[in-house]
Regions:
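ATP-dependent adenylation/nucleotidyltransferase module used to activate substrates
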Residues: 2-147, 153, 183-191
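Electropositive phosphate-/nucleotide-binding environments in soluble metabolic enzymes
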Residues: 6, 10, 73, 116, ...
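Short C-terminal domain-edge/linker segments immediately following a structured domain
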Residues: 92-98, 124, 164-169, 207-210, ...
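Catalytic subdomain that performs nucleotidyl-dependent activation
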Residues: 141-220
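An accessory alpha-helical subdomain
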Residues: 217-240
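Hydrophobic helical membrane-anchoring modules
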Residues: 241-245
Length: 245
């Protein structure tokens, strides 16, 4: 696969470019570490960020990190060779997250525990390799689902941030896909035949998640209200930026 031959659809370039500009996500001289699980979202974001490396009026470095939770069925070997073809720095970290969860998890969901452990490991890699920005692949559907979960279960109107700083104040976290729909990414990944790794988390298979429940509810509601996600984005936008408030 040759980068110059990959055409990124305007339906992806425009919303990602607008999000990067709206929230000042990437600045000249930044070193951006992209978290890649092997899913369609993060792999698509890799190509989009490479596009902006070539065409944006700023210069930034791009590296990739994968956290292997050491669960049966997760086979990330194809990712290393994939990123080698683009001469992209690739960092691979292993950690027995499920085993750790059995010993240490208290009053939390597996998904929340796993996300917290992975985030800590990614911060370690970013510091060790001198990256100041961590890019994550959540999209508009994810933000809408988080909003509904927070309102219904916690009584709070909040969702994931598009841009914020970690507690240690040394790494900025960005989500360039906040204006992009999941189905757009699925179509792009399929068209490019990206080496997508299927979700193999046993916790997700053993119990339906609340996120999946709200995902299906929102998609069903969208059939009745075609502008649903556009309206939800308008409602969420004031709460998405922590860095530039």
């Amino acid at each position: 696969m040759v980068l110059q031959r990959i055409k990124i659809p305007k339906l992806l370039v425009k919303p990602v470019g607008r999000a990067i500009a709206d929230f000042s996500m990437i600045r000249d001289g930044d070193r951006v570490l992209l978290a890649v699980s092997g899913g369609k979202d993060s792999l698509s974001l890799f190509h989009i960020l490479r596009h902006f490396q070539r065409h944006a009026p700023i210069n930034f470095d791009l590296g990739v990190v994968t956290i292997d939770p050491e669960v049966e069925g997760f086979e990330p070997q194809a990712l290393e060779s994939f990123f080698q073809r683009f001469e992209t720095p690739y960092f691979f970290e292993e950690f027995p997250i499920m085993e750790q969860a059995k010993q240490s998890m208290k009053g939390d969901s597996y998904c929340s525990f796993c996300a917290r452990i992975k985030r800590g490991l990614m911060y370690q890699v970013a510091r060790r390799e001198n990256y100041n920005v961590l890019a994550l692949g959540q999209h508009l559907d994810d933000l809408a689902e988080s909003l509904m979960m927070s309102m219904c279960h916690n009584g709070k109107i909040q969702t994931m941030k598009a841009h914020y700083v970690n507690d240690a104040k040394d790494i900025r976290i960005i989500r360039p896909l906040v204006y992009v729909r999941e189905r757009q990414l699925a179509s792009f990944a399929q068209e490019l035949k990206l080496p997508v790794i299927a979700d193999s988390c046993p916790a997700c298979f053993s119990m339906p998640t609340e996120r999946e429940h709200f995902k299906q509810w929102l998609l069903s509601e969208e059939q009745r209200t075609p502008n649903l996600y556009k309206n939800l984005l308008s409602a969420m936008k004031p709460m998405l930026d922590e860095v530039n408030d």
